[in-house]
Amino acid sequence: MSKLWGGRFTEEAEAWVEEFGASISFDQQLVNQDINGSMAHVTMLAKQGIVTQEEAEKIKIGLQYLLKEAKENKLQFSVEAEDIHLNIEKMLIEQIGEVGGKLHTGRSRNDQVATDMHLYLKEKVEHIIKATKQLQTVLVQQAENNIETIMPGYTHLQRAQPISFAHHILAYFWMLERDVNRYEDSLKRINISPLGAGALAGTTFPIDREYSAELLGFNGIYENSLDAVSDRDFILEFLSNSSMLMMHLSRFCEELILWSSQEFQFIEMSDQYATGSSIMPQKKNPDMAELIRGKTGRVYGNLFSLLTVMKGLPLAYNKDLQEDKEGMFDTVKTVEGCLHIMTGMLETMTVNKEKMGQAVTQDFSNATEIADYLANKGLPFRQAHEIVGKLVLYCTQKGIYLLDVSLETYKEMSSLFEEDLYEVLSPYAAVKRRNSAGGTGFEQIKNALEKAKGLTKEVIKN
């Protein structure tokens, strides 16, 4: 077939060259955005008298037909037409005649594709924000059910201090809240229109960029046409924000995997989110959590891939920029899928409160309580720290825990120890006393839950 840009050329490309250069296999995902962008563009052209109202109406009727066909998956795309833009233009001309060729007046594929991607990411980021909020709502529900569920808190994957399970869960709530904030902030840069920037230098036609931007729901326009067609910061920012979100999901999944093991038994995954072994009938594998952890690397790769593509590109458009889309599409699909799985997995998991409780009575995570006890009685904390270290050594040598040590032995270590020490050693009491702002104390958790509910109330309503 003859190319819409073929006037300059005397030879046709080989089929394999066409296939190598074509992007329609993946950029057809932008079909709705491409048609909607064209609707706004031709409306603006008519307003400015660049095309007649009659021509604009004919073009819009043709575009509306193609949009309907697209939504019903009836459009047949061709590699020969290269990309989504030329495919749609070719179909439009076939549908309404040569007047369809006037649609591209005052526009280039360079500003057209950038517009499509801005529209696409605006929609997808808003969807990801909503999905993240739904996950946060599940975290709030699990936290509410586990305010007084005591578990070991860890540093270096060693038991450190007793904490509330709700406190641990809410740590991820606030990580996700930062992710939401980053996505929301990025919308300020996504919601800007490059349409009308032309190939790189603007256009000689008297277009109204602000009007077409308004029609598409953008908050403004790019101030520089070179920047408009060559900028992919908005995609990189999306990939970066998504990498951080996936990192948070991956960290949580790592803990869920550990907690569901026989060595911990803190939680049990629902059968819906686990699989078995083809050879070992006893196995219940946390495959969905492992997949989320694994897919995090995939999202990181998409970010670094585009950063590498962009690092040496001169202004303005270069064909290298065709490589901006597949990683973006893949990241959207991956993040949406992981959020959906994570939400269901956390909503259906069973918390083994008894196992968690046993874990904090069979360790030394209450050692800091003794150091604080002595410090409250006037002993310098460093001296208290040394005494408790010796107590832990004594216990490990005897094969006992701090609650098992007699008061007589405690007094041999320091005359400051009294009977009330054993109240301090209770994991429940240890958690309750940590009432500093943001701490694991029950009152602090209740305060945190109120704030968290306020941030997710719109999701709960819907």
Swiss-Prot record:
Reaction(s) catalysed by this chain's protein: 2-(N(omega)-L-arginino)succinate = fumarate + L-arginine
Domain of life: Bacteria
EC number(s) given by UniProt: 4.3.2.1
Enzyme class: lyase
Pathway: Amino-acid biosynthesis; L-arginine biosynthesis; L-arginine from L-ornithine and carbamoyl phosphate: step 3/3
Major localisation: cytoplasm
Cellular compartments per GO CC: cytosol
BP GO terms, sorted: arginine biosynthetic process via ornithine; L-arginine biosynthetic process
Subcellular location, record wording: Cytoplasm
Family indicated by similarity: Belongs to the lyase 1 family. Argininosuccinate lyase subfamily.
Record's protein name: Argininosuccinate lyase
Originating gene: argH
